Amino acid sequence: MSIKKIFTIACLATSALYIQAADHCCKSLNIVSYNVRNGIGIDNVNNLCRTISTLRSTSPEIVCLQELDSVTGRMNQRYVLGELADSLNMHPSFAPAIDFMDGKYGIGILSQTKPISTKIVPLPGREEARTLLIAEFPEYVIACTHFSLTPDDQLLSIPIIEKEAEQWSKPFILAGDLNTEIPSATIDALNKSFVIISQTETPTHPSDKPQDLIDYILIDKAHAKEIKVTEAKAITGTIASDHIPQFITIELKCNKKCCK
């Protein structure tokens, strides 16, 4: 049996231990993580309509997006996240990572409702600055990121994220392009405080001939028992980006805040 298969079995066992069904669940969420490459497909055609169609097919409440331009010369001063938000009737939250061609380049979150608050946290990235975008909602917290290509920077990012997660008394869901596969030192480090709740069988890059699983959705272990994952899959068959989206549906455990 390969190391990857052994790790996958271990992940599933860990998930079964931490992610349990609540007796009564009162809120269901569709969550997507997608590196959209500004709507540039694997065929190098810039067609944001394909991205919109892919996302619309998932009926998402939350979308975590990576590789977004904001009014750059490269994208003819278009606000890509805003266009996606308008087309999907969602609220945009943008976090710039770097200045680029008279604009910004970074990550974003789309949400059906406006967040209570948002926070941008810098992360290490020696080849390119990285960031963490945190959005608070009444019953949960969403964090979107795009890790550095450098393993050392990935490892340095994890304690920063753990510190942010520890501040919340509700589920902290982390999603993004982590630029690392299973197994790796980065995943091993994340597994100490988080549980992977997205699928781990289907590679997510490149979209035409997927070979690498580098996109994930996770939850902090402290609150993992407060959700139930009812569906987890990769959205295959799309060439709208060089990545394949990760999709999950979760049920949030019933509590006083959401059961009123």
Task: Identify the residue ranges that each predicted region occupies.
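Active-site-proximal beta-strand elements of phosphoester/diester hydrolases
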Residues: 28-40, 119, 134, 139-148
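Repetitive helical segments and hydrophobic/amphipathic motifs
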Residues: 13-14
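Sec-exported extracytoplasmic/periplasmic mature domains
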Residues: 56-60, 85-89, 93, 115, ...
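Extracellular/periplasmic catalytic domains that process cell-envelope and extracellular macromolecules
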Residues: 25-26, 57, 85-86, 101-102, ...
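Structured beta-strand-rich core segments of catalytic domains in phosphoester-bond hydrolases
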Residues: 43-44, 52, 68-140, 226-236
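Active-site beta-strand/loop signature of hydrolases that rely on acidic residues for catalysis
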Residues: 29-36, 51-75, 142-145, 161-187, ...
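Metal-dependent phosphoester-hydrolase catalytic domains
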Residues: 120-122, 151-155, 163-173, 179-260
